[in-house]
Amino acid sequence: PNSRFAPAFGDRTGFGERSDTIMMWRVNPATSQVAVLSFPRDLYVKIAGRSAKRRINEAYERDQPQRLIDTIRNEFGIETDHFIQIDFCAFKTLVDAVDGVAVPFALPVRDVNTGLDVPEAGCYTFTGDHALAYVRSRKMQVFEDGRWSSNTGDDRARISRQQDFIRRTADSLLAAGAFNPSVVRALIETSDDFIVNDAELTLNKMLEFAGVLRNVDPAAITTYQIEASAERVQGSD
């Protein structure tokens, strides 16, 4: 609460009520190929077990992913083998474990809502809290021609930033040897209080996935977004 990035965390008393970021990962152990599909959090869909269409992030209930899993299967025909919820604290731990993640910027950027502040163009290294402020930013502004302007895109631009940050984090993890089984085990144990996963996604299974990721070129991770168009629904964009 004393961090200048506290707004990026939102109201922690309500954490888990809605998902902030939804991604489907496909990891192929045989080919070491990884694909990531992101869903806009404000995408309107028919929520499983409910009559009206709502934002997809409302399908998630605190530590209970089944409704979200069912919604994705019903709406997109995608089956889910495993589920993992990573909260803000686990995200921060991961970024700090590799001494931060560097991201290049052509111009200064900020988001007064999350506390994001990159004061000058160039390569900026984000540590835990500030990294969260960056990936959660929805009202990012750039400083150009002597003034701040909001022209950094919509939720799709936010998804692109998140996917790019994943690649850069993977690069940092590989460089730090963080996919080594002993390091992965330590990271998982350190973040255990901040991670929720299905019963079949055991520690050994996580280590198996880490072994696959160790052989993946982050630049070769394929990323996709669910196509959607902007529309005002019930007074909201």
Q: How should each PLM-predicted stretch be described?
A:
Residues 26-29, 44, 48, 61, ...:
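Sec-exported extracytoplasmic/periplasmic mature domains
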Residues 1-32:
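Entry/capping segment at the start of metal-dependent catalytic domains
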Residues 94-182:
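Flexible, polar/acidic helix-loop-strand segments at domain edges
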Residues 15-19, 50, 58-67, 85-89, ...:
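Soluble non-cytosolic domains of exported or imported proteins
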Residues 57-121, 200-206, 210, 216:
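Amphipathic, coiled-coil-like alpha-helical scaffolding segments used for oligomerization/assembly
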Residues 17-22, 31-39, 51-53, 67, ...:
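Extracytoplasmic
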Residues 3-5, 52, 126, 190, ...:
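C-terminal solvent-exposed extensions
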Residues 9-13, 53-62, 77-82, 121, ...:
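Second-shell loop/turn segments in exported
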